[in-house]
Structures are given as C-alpha cells and as structure tokens.
Amino acid sequence: MIERGKFRSLTLINWNGFFARTFDLDELVTTLSGGNGAGKSTTMAAFVTALIPDLTLLHFRNTTEAGATSGSRDKGLHGKLKAGVCYSMLDTINSRHQRVVVGVRLQQVAGRDRKVDIKPFAIQGLPMSVQPTQLVTETLSERQARVLPLNELKDKLEAMEGVQFKQFNSITDYHSLMFDLGIIARRLRSASDRSKFYRLIEASLYGGISSAITRSLRDYLLPENSGVRKAFQDMEAALRENRMTLEAIRVTQSDRDLFKHLISEATNYVAADYMRHANERRVHLDKALEFRRELHTSRQQLAAEQYKHVDMARELAEHNGAEGDLEADYQAASDHLNLVQTALRQQEKIERYEADLDELQIRLEEQNEVVAEAIERQEENEARAEAAELEVDELKSQLADYQQALDVQQTRAIQYNQAIAALNRAKELCHLPDLTADSAAEWLETFQAKELEATEKMLSLEQKMSMAQTAHSQFEQAYQLVVAINGPLARNEAWDVARELLREGVDQRHLAEQVQPLRMRLSELEQRLREQQEAERLLADFCKRQGKNFDIDELEALHQELEARIASLSDSVSNAREERMTLRQEQEQLQSRIQSLMRRAPVWLAAQNSLNQLSEQCGEEFSSSQDVTEYLQQLLEREREAIVERDEVGARKNAVDEEIERLSQPGGSEDQRLNALAERFGGVLLSEIYDDVSLEDAPYFSALYGPSRHAIVVPDLSQVTEHLEGLTDCPEDLYLIEGDPQSFDDSVFSVDELEKAVVVKIADRQWRYSRFPEVPLFGRAARESRIESLHAEREVLSERFATLSFDVQKTQRLHQAFSRFIGSHLAVAFESDPEAEIRQLNSRRVELERALSNHENDNQQQRIQFEQAKEGVTALNRILPRLNLLADDSLADRVDEIRERLDEAQEAARFVQQFGNQLAKLEPIVSVLQSDPEQFEQLKEDYAYSQQMQRDARQQAFALTEVVQRRAHFSYSDSAEMLSGNSDLNEKLRERLEQAEAERTRAREALRGHAAQLSQYNQVLASLKSSYDTKKELLNDLQRELQDIGVRADSGAEERARIRRDELHAQLSNNRSRRNQLEKALTFCEAEMDNLTRKLRKLERDYFEMREQVVTAKAGWCAVMRMVKDNGVERRLHRRELAYLSADDLRSMSDKALGALRLAVADNEHLRDVLRMSEDPKRPERKIQFFVAVYQHLRERIRQDIIRTDDPVEAIEQMEIELSRLTEELTSREQKLAISSRSVANIIRKTIQREQNRIRMLNQGLQSVSFGQVNSVRLNVNVRETHAMLLDVLSEQHEQHQDLFNSNRLTFSEALAKLYQRLNPQIDMGQRTPQTIGEELLDYRNYLEMEVEVNRGSDGWLRAESGALSTGEAIGTGMSILVMVVQSWEDESRRLRGKDISPCRLLFLDEAARLDARSIATLFELCERLQMQLIIAAPENISPEKGTTYKLVRKVFQNTEHVHVVGLRGFAPQLPETLPGTDEAPSQAS
C-alpha cells in the first residue's frame, strides 16, 4: 500500500513570542494547550500562512470576531510578527519518502497601512539530519543568533550538494509544486481554488458549520469534469475551425460570385449599350424614311387646309352680315313681347281693381245705412239718459231737502220749498209766469198734446227723410257711373249722355265678339308668311351653296338628280369601307402576328442560347427534343455510376478514418469503456504495459495474447469480484489478468513458438493456435506504422473521392442544366425562327400600308362629294314642301287687312272690358237721372228742428208733471200731518230714487254700448271710404298707364309675340351656331395650318438631321464592329434577345450594371480607369475596350493548375463545382464533429450518477460519526428540477428544439443556454451571455443540489444548521464535512498527480474545549481511520490521552516576551509510532 504523506514539523522564526521554534507534529493529533494569549492561535496562523501565502485571503480574527465581516486593520498577521525577517516553514515527507520543506519569508512593511511582504519558497533534497531552524538562523554566540535573509538562505542552500531551492513569484506555482509533491490534496489553479482551500482551513480552524462551505458544497465535493468540458471545448473548437474553413470557402465563393458578378454586369453593361446602338441605328434609318413620308403627306395636307380655309372665311363673312339684322329683329320682338306681357298684367290689375271697387261700393252703401240707424239710436239713448239723470237729481234734491227738514223740524217748509222750486222750474221751462199749482194740471194736458203733436210731426219728417235719401243715393250712383264712363259733365246732361253710352255699348260688344276669330285667322296667315320667308331664305342659301340660281320649277328635277348621285356615291363609299376594313383586318392580323412573334422571339433566342451552351458542354448536337431526352437518360446513367463509385470510395475512406481514430487512442485501447473499467478496478490495460514493444516483436506478442491482448491487469482478482456483479457497460468479452503492472511479464502462459505462429497452452486440455498477424497492432510502434500506411491510403482515397465528387457534381450540374432547359425551353427550342417570319411579315405590312394610303386618298374625295350631295338633298327636302308658299304673292296683303280689322275689334273689346260693368250697372237705374233731388238738405234741417221741438215739449211736460205731482205740498198745514206725510214721502222718494238710479244706470250702459258701436261703425265707414278712394285713384292710374303703353292686350297677343320672338331667336341661334362652328373650324383650320407649317419645318429639320446622324453613326458603328470581331466577343455582346427591348430598358439595364460595376472595380485601379473612360456616350468603342479588359483581367486570375481553360465563364463554372464539393465535404465533417443533444444528456446523467454513487460511498464512512445527540451525518444530493427537465428534453424531446442545435449561428453551448431559457422563462439570467450560461450547463455540478443532514436524537434527519445544534455538535458535524471534502479532493486529484503519491491530510481546531471527551475521542478515531493529522488548540484543563500535546506558556523576561513550550506524548495503552524527530520521553524546549 502507498503510504500517506505527513507533515513532520512546523517552524516559526521571529514571530511574536517565538524566535526560532519547531513544533514536531504528531501523525494523528497535535494539541496546543495553554491559557489565553499563550500563542496557540499564532502557531496555527503561522501554519496557515505557510500553507496559503495569499494576503487577499489571510484574515486571523479573534474568536469574538467570528461574526464580523472585517477584523483588525492588518487582518491579524502584522501584529503576530516581529520586526525584521520572519519565516514560517513546514517540513513534510511524502509517499515517495521525499523530504520537502515549504515555507514563506515574511517581513513587515513600514507605513501606516501595516502591510506584510510574503515570499514563498521550497527546499528539496534536504538531508533528514538538518533541522529547519539550522537553515534560516546563524549562531552568533552562545545566546545570540541571527535570522538569515532570503538571499543568504538561497546562497547557503545552493552551497549544499543535492539540495534544491526554489523561490516562487506566484502563489499558483508554489501550490502547483506542493500538489505535485503530495503536500496539498488539490491543485489550486486560480484564486477561486485558493479561496476554497482557505475557507476550508478557516472553517476547521474556528470550528462549527461553515456557511461559506455548506452553501457551495458542490464546488468543494464534486470534482470538475474537465474531460467532458475539454471534449466540448475541443468539439466547439473543431466546429469553429470547420466553420472558419466554410467561411473561407464562402469568401472564395464570394470571390467567385464577384467574378461571376463582374462578368455578368460587364456583359449587361456593354451588351445593353451595344444592342442599344444597333437598335438605334436601325431605328434611325426607319425614322429617316418615316420623316420623308410624313414630309410628303404634310405638304399635301397643308394645301388641302388652305383651300378649305378660303371657303370657310367666305361663308363666315356672310353669316356675320346676317347676324346683325337678326339681332335687331330679335330685340324688337323681345321688346314687343315685354310690352304685351306688361299690358296684360295691367289689364289684369284693372279688372281686379274694378271688381274690388264694385264690392267696396256695395259695402259702403250698406255701412252708411248702418251708421244712420246707429246715430238715431244714439240720440234716443242720450235723451233717455239725460231724462234719467234729471230725475235722479231731482229725487236726490228732494230727498236731501226732506232730510234737512227732518233735522230742523221744518219738514213742511222744505216740502213747500220743493214744490215752489218745481213750480218755478216749470214756469221757466214752459214760459208760463202765471203758472200756479192749481192751473198746472190744465197746462199739463196742453203741453202733453203739444208733445204728441211734435212727435207725430217728427215721425212724418223722418219718413220723408228716408225716402229722399234713397232717391238721392240712386241718382248719385247713376251720375257717378256716367262720369266714370264719359268723364265730367253737368248734372242736367247726365240723362242724355247715359242713353248715348248705352247705345254705343251694344255696338262695341258686337265688335268685341269678333276678336278671337280674327286673331286665329291672323295667326294662321302670319305663320304662313313666316314659312314663306323661311323657304325663301333656304332657297337663297341652297343656291349660294350650289353656286347657281335655280327657279322654283327646276327644284324637283334637281332633287331627283342629287338622290341618284347619292345612291351611286353611297355604293362606292360602302365598297370602299369594306375594302378598307379588309385591308385593316389584314394589317391588324399582321401586326398581331408580328407582336406575338416579337414576344416569342426573346424566348426562342434564350432557348437557342441555352441549347448552344448545352451542345458546347456535352459536345453533342441536338436536332429535336427527343435527342435531348435521350441524352438526359444517358447522363442520368453516368451520374448513377459515378455516385456509386464515389460512395464506395467514401465508405472506404470513412472506414480508414475510423480505424485511424481507433488506433490513435492512448494506451492502445480500442474501446473507451476499457479505460474506465481499468480505472474502476485499479488496474492497467495490457496494451498500455506493452505499449513500448518494438515493431519486430509486435506480431509475436499479438499472437501470444490473442483475444486477451485487450485485457486489464489488476493486482488482485479477488478485489475485482465485487465490481463484476451487475456489470453491463463493458465489452462482450472482458479479460482480467492478475499481476503487478510495474513488473509484469509473459510467464503466465506456456508457449511454443512455430513458424510465423505460436501455440499457447492455456490449460492441460485447452490450447490456442495463433498465427502472426500480417498487420500487427500490438504496441505503439505497430500502431504508428499502421496509422502511417492508413494515412497514405487515405490520401489516395481522398484524391480519388475528390475527383469522383467533382465529376458527380459536374454531371449533376449538367443534369440540372438539361432539366432547366427541358422545363423552360424545350417547348420552343426546336420551333421555326420567329425573326425570319417577322421579316417576311414586315415587308407585307409595308405593302398594305401603301395600299391603305392610296385607298384613303380616293375615298376622301368620294366622301366629300357624297357629303355635298347629301347636304343638297337635305336642303331640298326642306324647300320642296313649301313651293306653294313661294308662289303665293298676296299673302302679305291679306295679313295686313286682317291685322287692321283685328285692331278695331280689339279696341272695342278693350272698351267693353273697361266699361262693361259700369254700363251693366247703369242700365237698370238710368231712369233716376231724369229728376234731381235738390231739397234733400232742407228736409234734413226740418227733421232736425222737429226733433228739437219734440225734445223741448217732452221736458216741459215732465216739469209740469212734477208740479202736478207736488200739488199736495201746497196744502200742508199742520206739523203732525206733515210728519206723518213726510214719513210716507220719504219712503216713496227713496223707492223712486232707487228706480231712477237703476234707470239711469241702464241708460248710461246703453249709451256707452251704442256709442262704442257707433264709433266702430264710423271707423268701418271711414276705412271703406279710404279704400274706395285709394283703389279708385289706382284704377285711374292703371288705365292711364295702359293707354300710355299703346298695345292691345288680348289673350292671343302674348302667344303671337312669343312665337315671333322664338322664331327669330331660333334663326339667330342657328346663325350664331353656324358662325361659331365656322369660327372654330376656321380657328382650327388656321391652327392646323400653323401646326402643319411648323410640322413641315420640324420634319424638314429632323429629316436632314436624321440623315446626317445616320451618315455620321455609320463610321463609328463600323469601328465598333471591327473591334468586336477582332477581339472575338461578338458572341457575348450580340445578344439578339435584347433587340426586342426598348432603348429606355436597355439604358436602364446598362446604368444599373454601371452602378454595380463601380462598386465591383472600386479596388482595381486599372479597371476603374477603363470603366470611367467607357462612360463617355459619344465613344461606344470604349465600352468594348472595357469588356475586353475585364476578360483579360479574369483570364490572368485563373489558376491553370486547378482550372484548365482560358474562358472566364467556364472557369467560374468549374470553380463553382469545386467549391460546392468542398462545402459539401466540410458540412459532412461538421455533422460528424457535432455531438448530439442526447449524447450530452447521457454524458451528464452518467456523470451525475457516478458522483451520486461516490457521495453515497462517502456517506458510508460518516454513518458511525456521532457528536453529542448527533448519531450520524450524511450528504443529500438531488438533481434540480429545472435542470432535470432540461436533461429530459435533451434526451427525449430534442427533435422539438432542433432549430437551436441545427443553427450555424449558435455554438452548442449557446444553443443549450437558449433551450434552458426557453424551458424556464421565469428565471432571470441577468447580464450573463448565452455562451457563459451554456458552459455552466455543461458542468454537471450545476445540475445538483447538496445539503448536509444530521440524525439528531428524536428529531430524526434534519438539515445541519448551527442554530439547530449545540456548539460541540456543530463543531463535530463541521469537521465531518471538512473531512469529506478533503477526501473528495483527493479522489478528484488522483488522476492529475502520480499514482504513487497519497497527499497529506491535516485540519485544525481552535478552542477545542467546546467539545466533550466523547466528541474528542470521536475525532481521534476519525483521524486514525482516515490517516489524517489534526492540530487542536485547547485550554489548560484538556489533556488528551492520544497524540502529542504542547504546553504553551507566555512569559516576559527583561522586557522580552517569549513562549515557553513543553511537549508531551500521549500515555494511552496503545501508543502510536514515535514521531519523527522526537524522543519517547517528554521533551522541553526553551
């Protein structure tokens, strides 16, 4: 067994309290015992500093600072050192029994920052007799010594023979040496690794469960699977390299594309310009001929337009002369129509006002009667009201007098006075001074009779007044009617004038009845007269158009002649139309056919070009589509044969590649599983043992071992048995050989060697005969020889494969070209030449155009004659029906006669219309005019006088009645009778007063009502009188206006005037329309003449310019054609399909190509200059020079060693085939390199299972560990849910996410990161890149979650946390975790260092007093079982029975502080081996 390395001692030089002290370390437990400040922590700090000399990590805080994030300012190191040079050295011996001293030189740096300078070093080959203190100190005297600086130490060691001194500038190199020599358990490559190691030491130093370690147990316990990561990195590197190669190929393809683009654009640029010039030359020739034809045609058109202009100017002058007369007539007719319409409106108003006046007259008479009656009633009401008022006043007076008499007791006197007052009033009214009370009654009868007489007289006069008023009203009415008809006259003449007016009215009515017949007759004659005038005008116009005067009798014969001419010309025009239609149909058919052929020509030409290219590529001539299909079948057969041969060569090449890969495996293992099994069994492959066998001995040993040459050599077969149970991941036959791999020989077999063969006696009854292999593979030399031959074969196969691939791709491209040709051009490639047919059709089209032109000229003349004859017939058709009107000469006289009669009748009708109503009213009352009622006014005065007399008589009778009524008052004599009488009188007076007041009220109401009614009647009467007077005045004004107008206003006058106006308007409109037509036609004719004149000048100029241009271009075109033929590029430039494009399309094509060429040749000075010169449009030959320069440029860049052709186009085709083959080959290689997602998932899952098994094995070692109530400790390892889902998707659902893994833009790591983000969108990835995330996902450790659990008392298994455990339990559990970590590191690092080295194991524990005796014993047992060293710091009351104990006491002597150390070996019954460098007895050092 390999012995584990050990730390022999720790040496402190010039530390605080330790000048030169070496602590010999026990193989198990070393205890530092002492009180507070004794130096225990300083000793451990020196050990840790020598172990990890990283100032960024070192932090020696006190135990009380355990929870602090920062300790003292110097992190605890500066204060533990003394001034000057200090050392901390570890003396070790490894598994190879090599003594190695490693340490650091420390020195305080002056300054307030309290920094420390550290220099790590190592010493090898130091004799065992030399102590570390002797190296770094120099004895000056018996009690004085000096610490050597590092350079003197180096010089001192270099002087010693066999001793090596190494000083390190980096901590990484220092730790690398310590790892290689087995001092530390893990290779510390980075600051992160050093931090983990320091956290481990720090956790063990201060005890307890370190949260920094438990939070990241994966980093501490799980080894980094660098092999898998390296494989992925190599794979991605190979993929990157492959993709870079592909990118380089793409760049080459882009160059090829550039060449192809350059040729294509140069061809487009020059060919488009070349064909444009060719087309323009042909177009210019055609234009010159066309200009000449148009010049001749335009001259003929100008002459015709000039003749036409003269005729239209003459006709326009005639119409201008006639238009003035027509306008004057039309204006007169319009004015007459307006006068007639005005007169009619006036007549209508007059009639309406007359009717209104009659109605107002009637209403006025009625209202006069109503007002008269109202006046009478008003007078009666006034008299009644006045009487009632007088009676009331008298009664009130009497009543007042009576009341006064009662008050003063003078009633008799009052009544007497009242009677006297009444008597006096009666005397006054009746003019009777002698009137007495006794005679009052007699006078009353007299005055009553007088009143009755006056009333009768008044009634008689009233009757007479009414009769006189009626007679006076009728006379006035009749007189006013006569005055309205005849005008003012004397009243005595009214009777005679009225009779004369009635007789005249009868005559006027008779004449008025003849107005309508006369008007109809006049309208008929006027219409005939207008038709006669229109016929005369049409005849004059016809004669003017015909240029000859015709008699009326000649018109019918002329009409027949013109109709016969129209019939003949119509037949001619119809036949010409049919002939023209036939010619045009043929022309359109030719044009359509030409257009169709022109559309088909580019397709046919493209098909011919494609067919010619195919013929050149395959060297065959094709005359029909059947030839093409037959050759395509032959091509398919050749392609199939080439593909079969290529696939066979490719399969053989792949087999060679696989064999080379298999033989290139390290150790000669052809199966990777054997390496894993060898590592698992702790053995070595047999092929690895015989790896150095020579090439000559290889056949022998290959035959000797036969099938077992892939066996695994193990030290002990019995230890392998347990691993074989359930083993499935292994070859079908697994051979195991027991032996020492370091001293293995072939003595395990009994062998007889034959000629080129051996006989191996495996057992007594089993032999094996094996011949020497022709190609031995046993041993590195044999494999390298085979690999070399395989490489040579692979080169041959690769070359053959490339050739076949090139041929296959060439055949495939040819097949694709044939397929494209068949799909695009086969239908038209073997049809007739459309261009030849186009030439034939163009010649026929020219003949048709000439025939059409001649036909058009003839047809134009016939059409003019036909139009003239047609116009003549139309005019005669309008004239012939009016020949009888043209022969009637008396029509105008008859019209004048009827018009005079109509005027007389209309005058009579106007009289009847004006005075008819007055005559009708006058006729029944005309007799009243015989006498004039002049006494009407005197009668009115008498009637008024009688009314006054009747009123006075009534008042006198009333006064006498009152006297008679008061007659008793005169006879009152005594007061008693007076009182009694007064009482009765009072009541009567009151009753009469009430009755009188009521009567007065009624009279007042009646008076007010009748007064209001009378006022209303008077207002109505005044309104009627005002309306009557106003309308009478308006009527007189209207009659005067009608007389002033001087136009007859009958019902037909307006219609006749309107008809006359409309006829004149129509004539004027026709004349103006014709004049406008002539003006427009004349303007158009003049414009046409101007246009034709300008066109003639332009055509002459264009024709001569075109002729000159054609002649000039001919010389330049000849130079271009000569250059094209001399350089042999006519086939490239003369692209006939471009001849069918327009000049704009060709110019656009050339300009686009020019823009692309400027970019393409921007880096080529020569081509850029030639291109710039070629842009001159006046020098087309320079474009040919540019095209020749491009071809020459590309010919110079063709690699003749690869592509053997001078044609750049063919070179590009061959280059494209070769690049396509390389792309295909590299793409297949990339597919081989790429690892599948399922493989990744399997690798990670297997790694996880292996590590879970390893953790399970570690847990078995911790099952028996117990501290306090903690009965056991274990690690739980689980796969994270999100990562488990990722693995499931990678292994089972990867097809759904092939868009990520098949993307060329993503590496495998990036694709894995994208998939993880897709599956877990809720997780925030932060600022990390997909590449970083993917690399983390390739690390299996990130898939696992780890936590420590303890089995504590009755709680069962629970998570190990400091808060849930006691201090001792936490320390023990933490120590168990650290031990597990250290063991894991050793397992991880076993593959990295030599197999003969087992590293040192050492941990710390400060303040161990927190553990009880049982826990301390458990630690000792754990150290013994794991061969681990432990340094414990304990107070004075702890004295362990095992290991070595150092008693530390800090003392001060003469102001000098030092630590007194006493070492004691354990005294338990079972003593460990003696510590190196110490005696069994206790030792003491000062």
From Swiss-Prot:
Annotated binding of ATP, by residue: 34-41
Q: Name one GO biological process term.
A: chromosome condensation
Q: Please give the GO cellular component terms listed in this UniProt entry.
A: cytoplasm; nucleoid
Q: Which residue stretches, if any, does this entry annotate as coiled coil?
A: 326-418, 444-480, 509-603, 835-923, 977-1115, 1209-1265
Cross-referenced InterPro entries: MukB, MukB/SMC, MukB_hinge, MukB_hinge_sf, MukB_N_dom, P-loop_NTPase
**Domain description from the entry?**
The hinge domain, which separates the large intramolecular coiled coil regions, allows the homodimerization, forming a V-shaped homodimer.
Protein function: Plays a central role in chromosome condensation, segregation and cell cycle progression. Functions as a homodimer, which is essential for chromosome partition. Involved in negative DNA supercoiling in vivo, and by this means organize and compact chromosomes. May achieve or facilitate chromosome segregation by condensation DNA from both sides of a centrally located replisome during cell division.
The entry's protein name is Chromosome partition protein MukB
| Gene name of the record | mukB
